Amino acid sequence: MRAVETDGQWALRSPYDGSVQSTIPARNLWIRLLTARIETGEPYIIYIDTVNRQIPQHHKLAGLKVKTSNLCSEITLPTGLDNDGKQRTAVCCLSSLNIDTYDQWKDNAQFVEDVMRFLDNVMTDFINRAPDEFAHAKYSAMRERSVGLGVMGLHSYFQQKNIPFGSVMSKVWNKKIFKNIQEKVDLASKNLADERGACPDAEEYGIKERFSNKTAIAPTASISIICGGSSPGIEPIAANSFTHKTLSGSFNVRNKYLKKTLQKYNKDTDAVWSYITTNQGSVSHLDFLTADEKDTF
């Protein structure tokens, strides 16, 4: 990334012997990566040095290191041989809160803890019932009990409140929401450690945590659709109107909060939606919307 910032060159090295095969401008490579991400959703990108700086303290003390992630890159757990000479295979145990309904549960002290209990129960069930062929995964799950509580619907919540994505107000709400979640997750981990015992990785160093890792932002594309069409993960909505192709057929998907705004102007018509669709889901051409509404959608 420093080479991208300075418009420097980047060496393409052989994965076999590390020799430089070619040198290209770093920004050109970065642009190609971002273009591929937009068009195909891949490749996923992680910053491994940052990941290892942020691993739990007891994993640092144990000399554990993250070498890779899962495909979607939200799970970054230690793999390979640990200090006891045993193999670890990372395990994903995930759930996602719907920020679109944040106002319904934000002040409920028990809600997040209940979700963390659910994840802890799922982890225990996996450890107890997984076949011996999953021995490395069972061992890793037993030692660290890492889970990942994530979210979906962040952009939907902003649109619900008429807050443009990337605005100062959205940044304020972003920090407020995730501070609230993190505080409740941390408390749940300590409460469960008191009740059920700390995970072995943490207990070895006198640290009272039920979970080594607690949060992870997964893409949530499918479950966001199931949850009423909330926006996926923490991503901005790509288009206000688009065709969703499935095995059951093709369906026109329309932004539910834009629909309410159009109804306010008596413009919730097929003609207007068709116009939005032909403009790649954009509303910038709709002259009856205010500047704030255009920024929001």
Q: Regions from the language model: what does each represent?
A:
Residues M1-F297:
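Long, C-terminal-biased catalytic regions of enzyme "large/alpha" subunits
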